C-alpha cells in the first residue's frame, strides 16, 4: 500500500468501504450529482436491532490498498456502485460487460454491487434485475436513495454472515493465517503445526473478528475481541498485527467516548432510535478501569442484550489517556516495518484528531512531527502537495497556526516546483492566501491600524512578496498592485530605506499598466480583497477645518433676544441639554462655510520615505452637501517632518457638511483615506454648516497700502491697511472704490468707523462720509463698481506748555497761568534749554517735534443674495494708519478788554513747528507769516460769546459720571463754538497744504469767563443810536442830547432795582482825566437814572438828556450807586460801556 488516506479518522474503522465509479463516458457534473445523493445515505439502522451501519464512499480507490483488507477490514472494498449512460438497447450488452470488468477489479472482496443506468428505456429497462437500476434521465431518479438503502442492507447480510462464520470457534478446525501482502513470502516453509504459529493465527483471526464486529455495530464484542487479540499477539511478538489490534482497540474506544466523531463530521454517529446513557458525560474521566468481559459471555448474536443496552456498564474501553498511550505503542510497532509506512502515517493522523478533541496540542504535535519524518515511496508532486496540505490542516486543528501556515506555504511552493511542466500558479496563490492567518496577516489594512504589530514582520513581508509574484504569474496585475500596496502600507515601518525604494519602484512599474483603485477585488472562490488606502503616504497627524478669511466670514444678524437665546427651549439655561450635546460639540464647528466660496482644510502631513514623495490629485472626501473638491499636487521632501498642506473645495449647496477624509494618488495608486481610519489623528471637529451664498466685496482706495498691520481688539482682522501722513488740522479725502467680485448682487451696505487710538485727544469728526449717492446705485450687480469719499480730518491738541516769548507785565492770562504782554507782536526763536529732559515728558502734550499716530478701522457691513434672506452678512475692515505731524502750536493764550464791553482781544502765541514757511490767519484778519520754528503773537478781536448753557435737569446730570465731567463737557462745547467763530487756518505754500487750527483744549475757565458775554446786557443809546467807545457820537453844541440806558436780563433770576449816575469827563491823552465839567456840560433834569426790578428775559429802560455848551470830545462814565443792588452781582455783570460824544460847533 503506497497511497495514504490523509482523511482517515478513528471512526472510519467501523465503516464499510463502497467505491462509486463511472462506466463509460459520463459527464463529471452528472456523476457528482448522483454521487452526492449516494453519499447522503452514509448511515443506516439495521432492522429489528439497535445496531447501525456506517458507509464510507470513495469515487477513487487504489486496488493495491484493497489487498490490506484482511489487516484492517475498513480498507476492504465491500461494495461497488457504477454509474453509466446508455441511450440505446444495442449498447446495453457492452455496457453491462464493462460493469462486470469493473467488478473483477475488486472481485475478491466485494460483498455486493449495483449498476445505475441512465437514459435507457424500453424492454430492457423494464426487466427486473436486483443489481441494475434503470432511470430515464438524471432528473427523474427519485428512488436512488432507496436503492442505496437496499444495497446497504444486502451488505449487512453478507457482513453478518462473515462475522458469525469467523466468530464460531469450532474445535479441530484449522484457522487460516491472515497476512499482509509483503508477509506472504516470509511464511513459506514455516511449521504450521507449531503452537507459536497457531497462536499467531488465532490472534490475527481474533483481531479480524473484532474488525467485523466493529463494522457490524457491535462495539462491546469488538472491544472483547481486540483485548483477546492483543494478549494472543503480544505472546508471540507479532508486532505488526499487535499494532493493528491496539489501533482497533483505540478506534473502538474513541467511538465509544466521542460519539460525535473526531474527523470533523457535522453529524454525530448515533444509533437511530436510541439515546445515549446518562453516564456519557463521564466517559472522558481519566483512569477508567479496564475489566475484561468473560469470553464465555459472547454468543453468536453478540453480548447479552441486557448488557448491550447500557454500554456504560461495560468498562472494556480505554480511557482517553490510555487511548493515546495505545496509539503510541501501535505506532512504535508499525515503525518496525518499512512496508507499513502508510499504516503508521494514517495512525499518526488518527491519533492527532483524537488529541485535538482532547485539546492536547503539544502531544498532538509530537505525533505530527513523527508523521513528517515517515519515509514513503517516491511521492509525486501532487501527492506531496496533498501531504503538506493535510499536515497544515492538522496543525491548524490542534491550534498550531504558524506551523500550519508553514506547511501550507510549503504546499504552495510545491505547486510551482521547477520539476512541474505546467506550474499551478493559481493553486499556489490560493494556498498562500490560506497561510495568511497563521502568520498573523489579514487582507484588511484596518487590522494593522491599531495597536502594536503582531507577528514576524520579516516572514510576513516574504509571504506578501510571494503573493505579489504569484498574482503576476497568474496574469492578474490588479492583484499584484493590491498586494504590493498592502505590503507598503502595513510593513512600512519594517522596510529599510533600500527596500522602500525597491518596493515603490516595483509598484510604479505595475501601476503604469494597471493603476491601483479603491474597488474591492473579488476572487473566483468568493474571497474579497478590500481596498488599501495609503494612509501612511503621507502620514497625516492633524486635520483642521479652517474658517473663511475674516473679510469673508458670515455673521448672523442678532435677534432681539440676543444670540445666546435658543428658540428650541423655553428655558434660559439647561445643563442637561448641554451635557447631552457634548459629543456633538466636539464634532461640530462654531463657524460656517458659505455656498460658492472656496473653503479650506489644513492637514499636517509627514513624509516617512527616504526620498521625495510626489502626491498627486489630493482632495477632500465629504458628505452631506454637494461639494466640488479642487485637487492639489504635493512634493514633500524626504523625511520632511510635519508639513502643512491646505486642501480646498467649493460647497455647491447648503446644509451640514462633514469632512470624512481625503483622497490621494501616490505611486499610481488611488486612495480614499477616511479620518476614522487614521491612527493618532488630532482633529477639532469635521462637521460644519454651509449657509446660502453671499456677495463678495473688494475695496480699493486712493491711498497707498500700509506696511504696518493694525491690531484691533476682540480678535478682529483687517483685510486691507492704508496709511497717510497729515499735518495737525489738515483734511484729506479718501476715495473708496467698492467692487462686487462675487456672484450675488450686493443689496445692503453699512459703513461704521472705530478709533483704535485712545491716548490722543481728537477734536471734531476724524472720519466723515456720505453714502446716499452710493446707495442709490444698489443693488450692485456682480462685476459692478461704486465709489464714495471719506474725509479724514486730523485735528489734535494745538496747545504747548513752552514759554517761547518773553513774559511781559500785563493783565493777560496765559495757558500756564503767567501774565502776558499787550497785543503787539514779539518774535523769538525757541529756547533749546527750555525743552524737557525727561523722555517721558517728551511724549506729553507740547512736544514740539513729536509725530503722533492715529489708527482707525472702517467697517463695511454688507449683504445680499440668498444669504441676506436668511439673515447673514459679511464684514470687511479697512485699516487706516494716520501719522499726524505738528503744524502750529499755541504756546500761550490770553485776553485783553476791548473798548467795547461786547468785545475783547484774544492773544495767541503761535509757533511754527514745521520745516517750512507757514502762514496763519483768522476770520477777517490778515495773514501772519511764520518761518520754520518761529513763534509770533497774534491778536484777534472777537465779539464776546453768549454760551448756551448745558441743561441741568436730573436726567441730564445722570448721564455724566460726576460734576467734573459735566464741567468738562461744557468747556468743550464752548471751545468748539469759539474755534468755529475764530476760524483760524494755516497754510504751507511750498507744499500746497493747508488746514485749520483750533483753540479747543487751550481755554481755561478764567479765559472763558473773559470771553463770555455778561448775562446782563447794557445798551446805551445817544439820540437813539447805539453808542460804543470806538465810534464817537456827534452832536451840536447847544442842542440837547437824548441819553437812553437799556437793560436786558438774560440771567435765570430777577435783578434790580438799580440807581445809575452819569459822570462826564475829558481824557487829555496823558493819563489825566478832567471831571470838573460843570461849566461845560449841563444835564436836562437829573444826572441819576433809576431802573426798576427786571424779571428774567425782561427789559427796562431809563431816559435822560445832556446839553453840551462847548465843543470837544467828552466821555460819559455811567456808575452804579454804592448802596445799589449791583454789589450783589459779579463785576462783569454790571460793566457798562463808556460813551464817547463829540460836540461840534453850530453850523452856519
From Swiss-Prot:
Chief localisation class: Golgi
Keyword Secreted appears in the UniProt entry: no
Assigned GO CC terms: cytoplasm; endoplasmic reticulum; TRAPPII protein complex
InterPro entries: TRAPP_II_complex_Trs120 (IPR013935)
A single BP term in Gene Ontology: neuron differentiation
Disulfide bridge map: none
Cellular localisation: Golgi apparatus, cis-Golgi network; Endoplasmic reticulum; Cytoplasm
Tissue-level expression: Expressed in neurons of the pyramidal layer of the cortex, in spinal cord motor neurons and white matter neurons (at protein level).
Alphabetized UniProt keyword annotations: Cytoplasm, Differentiation, Endoplasmic reticulum, Golgi apparatus, Phosphoprotein
Cytoplasm keyword on record: yes
Source species, domain of life: Eukaryota
Entry-annotated residues carrying Phosphoserine: 566, 953
One Pfam family it belongs to: TRAPPC9-Trs120
Family affiliation: Belongs to the NIBP family.
Role summary: Functions as an activator of NF-kappa-B through increased phosphorylation of the IKK complex. May function in neuronal cells differentiation. May play a role in vesicular transport from endoplasmic reticulum to Golgi.
Quaternary assembly: Component of the multisubunit TRAPP (transport protein particle) complex, which includes at least TRAPPC2, TRAPPC2L, TRAPPC3, TRAPPC3L, TRAPPC4, TRAPPC5, TRAPPC8, TRAPPC9, TRAPPC10, TRAPPC11 and TRAPPC12. Directly interacts with IKBKB and MAP3K14.
Name listed for the protein in its UniProt record: Trafficking protein particle complex subunit 9
Amino acid at each position: 500500500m503506497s497511497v495514504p488516506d490523509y482523511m482517515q479518522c478513528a471512526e472510519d474503522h467501523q465503516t464499510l468501504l463502497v467505491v462509486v465509479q463511472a462506466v463509460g463516458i459520463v459527464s463529471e457534473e452528472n456523476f457528482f450529482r448522483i454521487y452526492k445523493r449516494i453519499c447522503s445515505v452514509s448511515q443506516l439502522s439495521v432492522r429489528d436491532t439497535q445496531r447501525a451501519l456506517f458507509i464510507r464512499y470513495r469515487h477513487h480507490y487504489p486496488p493495491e490498498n484493497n489487498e490490506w483488507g484482511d489487516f484492517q477490514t475498513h480498507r476492504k472494498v465491500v461494495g461497488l456502485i457504477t454509474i453509466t449512460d446508455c441511450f440505446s438497447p444495442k449498447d446495453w450488452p457492452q455496457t453491462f460487460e464493462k460493469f462486470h470488468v469493473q467488478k473483477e477489479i475488486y472481485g475478491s472482496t466485494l460483498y455486493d454491487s449495483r449498476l445505475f443506468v441512465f437514459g435507457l428505456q424500453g424492454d430492457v429497462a423494464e426487466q427486473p434485475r436486483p443489481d441494475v437500476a434503470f432511470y430515464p434521465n438524471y432528473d427523474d431518479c427519485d428512488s436512488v436513495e432507496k436503492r442505496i438503502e437496499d444495497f446497504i442492507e444486502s451488505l449487512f447480510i453478507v457482513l453478518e454472515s462473515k462475522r458469525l462464520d469467523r466468530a464460531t470457534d469450532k474445535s479441530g478446525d484449522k484457522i487460516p493465517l491472515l497476512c499482509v501482502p509483503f508477509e506472504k513470502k516470509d511464511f513459506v516453509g514455516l511449521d504450521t503445526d507449531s503452537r507459536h504459529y497457531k497462536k499467531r493465527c488465532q490472534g490475527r483471526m481474533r483481531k479480524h473478528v473484532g474488525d467485523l464486529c466493529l463494522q457490524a455495530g457491535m462495539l462491546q464484542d469488538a472491544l472483547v475481541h481486540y483485548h483477546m487479540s492483543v494478549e494472543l499477539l503480544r505472546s508471540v511478538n507479532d508486532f505488526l498485527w499487535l499494532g493493528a489490534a491496539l489501533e482497533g482497540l483505540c478506534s473502538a474506544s474513541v467511538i465509544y467516548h466521542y460519539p460525535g466523531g473526531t474527523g470533523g463530521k457535522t453529524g454525530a454517529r448515533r444509533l437511530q432510535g436510541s439515546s445515549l446513557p446518562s453516564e456519557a458525560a463521564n466517559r472522558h474521566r481519566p483512569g477508567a478501569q479496564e475489566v475484561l468481559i468473560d469470553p464465555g459471555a459472547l454468543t453468536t448474536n453478540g453480548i447479552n442484550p441486557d448488557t448491550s443496552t447500557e454500554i456504560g456498564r461495560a468498562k472494556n474501553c480505554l480511557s482517553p489517556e490510555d487511548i493515546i498511550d495505545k496509539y503510541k505503542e501501535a505506532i512504535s510497532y508499525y515503525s518496525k516495518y518499512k512496508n507499513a509506512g502508510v499504516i503508521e502515517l494514517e495512525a499518526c493522523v488518527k491519533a492527532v484528531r483524537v488529541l485535538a478533541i482532547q485539546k492536547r496540542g503539544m502531544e498532538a504535535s509530537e505525533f505530527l512531527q513523527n508523521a513528517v519524518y515517515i519515509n514513503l515511496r517516491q511521492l509525486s508532486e501532487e501527492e506531496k502537495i496533498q501531504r503538506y496540505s493535510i499536515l497544515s490542516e492538522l496543525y491548524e486543528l490542534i491550534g498550531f497556526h504558524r506551523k500550519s501556515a508553514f506547511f501550507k506555504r510549503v504546499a504552495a511552493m510545491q505547486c510551482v516546483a521547477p520539476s512541474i511542466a505546467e506550474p499551478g500558479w493559481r493553486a499556489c496563490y490560493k494556498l498562500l492566501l490560506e497561510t495568511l492567518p497563521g502568520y498573523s496577516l489579514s487582507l484588511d489594512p484596518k487590522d494593522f491600524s491599531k495597536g502594536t504589530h503582531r507577528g514576524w514582520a520579516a516572514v510576513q513581508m516574504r509571504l506578501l512578496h510571494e503573493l505579489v509574484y504569484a498574482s503576476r504569474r497568474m496574469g492578474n496585475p490588479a492583484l499584484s498592485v493590491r498586494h504590493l500596496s498592502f505590503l507598503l502600507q502595513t510593513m512600512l515601518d519594517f522596510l529599510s530605506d533600500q527596500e522602500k525604494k525597491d518596493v515603490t519602484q516595483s509598484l510604479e512599474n505595475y501601476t503604469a499598466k494597471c493603476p491601483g483603485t479603491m474597488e474591492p477585488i473579488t476572487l473566483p472562490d468568493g474571497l474579497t480583497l478590500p481596498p488599501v488606502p495609503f494612509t501612511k503616504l503621507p502620514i497625516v497627524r492633524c486635520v483642521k477645518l479652517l474658517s473663511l478669511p475674516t473679510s469673508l466670514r458670515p455673521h448672523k444678524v442678532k435677534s432681539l433676544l440676543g444670540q445666546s437665546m435658543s428658540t428650541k427651549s423655553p428655558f434660559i439655561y439647561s445643563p442637561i441639554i448641554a451635557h447631552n450635546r457634548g459629543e456633538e460639540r466636539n464634532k461640530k464647528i462654531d463657524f460656517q462655510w458659505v455656498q460658492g466660496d472656496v473653503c479650506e482644510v489644513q492637514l499636517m502631513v509627514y513624509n516617512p520615505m527616504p526620498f521625495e514623495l510626489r502626491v498627486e490629485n489630493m482632495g477632500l472626501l465629504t458628505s452631506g452637501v454637494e461639494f466640488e473638491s479642487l485637487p492639489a499636487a504635493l512634493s514633500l521632501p524626504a523625511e520632511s517632518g510635519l508639513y502643512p498642506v491646505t486642501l480646498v473645495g467649493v460647497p455647491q449647496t447648503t446644509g451640514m457638511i462633514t469632512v470624512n477624509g481625503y483622497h490621494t494618488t501616490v505611486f499610481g495608486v488611488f486612495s480614499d483615506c477616511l479620518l476614522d481610519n487614521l491612527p493618532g489623528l488630532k482633529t477639532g471637529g469635521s462637521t460644519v454648516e454651509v449657509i446660502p451664498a453671499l456677495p463678495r466685496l473688494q475695496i480699493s482706495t486712493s491711498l497707498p497700502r500700509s506696511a504696518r498691520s493694525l491690531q484691533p481688539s476682540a480678535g478682529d482682522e483687517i483685510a486691507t491697511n492704508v496709511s497717510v501722513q497729515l499735518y495737525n488740522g489738515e483734511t484729506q479725502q479718501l476715495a473708496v472704490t467698492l467692487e462686487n467680485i462675487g456672484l450675488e448682487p450686493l443689496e445692503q451696505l453699512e459703513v461704521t468707523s472705530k478709533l483704535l487710538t485712545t491716548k490722543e485727544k481728537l477734536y471734531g469728526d476724524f472720519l466723515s462720509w456720505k453714502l446716499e449717492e452710493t446707495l442709490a446705485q444698489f443693488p450692485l450687480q456682480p462685476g459692478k463698481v461704486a465709489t464714495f469719499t471719506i474725509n479724514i480730518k486730523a485735528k489734535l491738541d494745538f496747545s504747548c506748555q513752552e514759554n517761547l516769548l518773553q513774559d511781559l507785565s500785563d493783565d493777560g492770562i496765559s495757558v500756564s497761568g503767567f501774565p502776558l504782554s499787550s497785543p503787539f507782536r514779539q518774535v523769538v526763536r525757541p529756547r533749546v534749554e527750555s525743552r524737557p529732559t525727561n523722555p517721558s515728558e517728551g511724549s506729553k502734550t507740547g512736544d514740539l517735534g513729536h509725530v503722533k499716530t492715529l489708527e482707525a478701522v472702517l467697517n463695511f457691513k454688507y449683504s445680499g443674495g440668498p444669504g441676506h434672506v436668511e439673515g447673514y452678512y459679511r464684514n470687511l475692515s479697512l485699516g487706516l494708519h494716520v501719522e499726524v505731524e505738528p503744524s502750529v502750536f499755541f504756546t500761550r493764550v490770553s485776553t485783553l478788554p476791548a473798548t467795547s464791553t461786547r468785545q475783547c482781544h484774544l492773544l495767541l502765541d503761535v509757533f511754527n513747528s514745521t520745516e517750512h514757511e507757514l502762514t496763519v490767519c483768522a476770520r477777517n484778519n490778515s495773514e501772519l507769516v511764520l518761518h520754520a520754528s518761529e513763534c509770533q503773537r497774534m491778536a484777534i478781536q472777537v465779539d464776546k460769546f453768549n454760551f448756551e448753557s448745558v441743561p441741568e435737569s436730573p436726567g441730564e446730570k445722570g448721564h455724566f459720571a460726576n460734576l467734573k465731567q459735566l464741567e468738562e463737557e461744557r468747556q468743550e462745547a464752548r471751545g468748539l463754538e469759539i474755534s468755529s467763530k475764530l476760524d483760524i487756518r494755516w497754510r504751507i505754500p511750498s507744499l500746497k497744504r493747508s488746514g485749520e487750527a483750533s483753540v479747543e483744549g487751550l481755554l481755561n475757565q478764567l479765559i472763558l469767563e473773559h470771553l463770555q458775554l455778561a448775562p446782563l446786557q447794557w445798551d446805551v443809546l445817544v439820540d437813539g443810536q447805539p453808542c460804543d467807545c470806538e465810534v464817537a457820537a456827534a452832536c451840536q453844541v447847544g442842542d440837547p442830547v437824548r441819553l437812553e440806558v437799556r437793560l436786558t436780563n438774560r440771567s435765570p433770576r430777577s435783578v434790580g432795582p438799580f440807581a445809575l449816575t452819569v459822570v462826564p469827563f475829558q481824557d487829555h491823552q496823558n493819563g489825566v482825566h478832567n471831571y470838573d465839567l460843570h461849566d461845560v456840560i449841563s444835564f436836562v433834569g437829573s444826572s441819576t437814572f433809576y431802573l426798576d426790578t427786571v424779571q428774567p428775559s425782561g427789559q427796562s429802560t431809563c431816559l435822560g438828556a445832556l446839553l453840551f455848551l462847548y465843543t470837544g470830545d467828552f466821555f460819559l462814565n455811567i456808575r452804579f450807586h454804592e448802596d445799589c443792588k449791583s454789589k450783589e452781582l459779579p463785576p462783569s455783570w454790571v460793566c457798562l460801556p463808556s460813551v464817547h460824544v463829540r460836540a461840534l460847533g453850530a453850523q452856519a
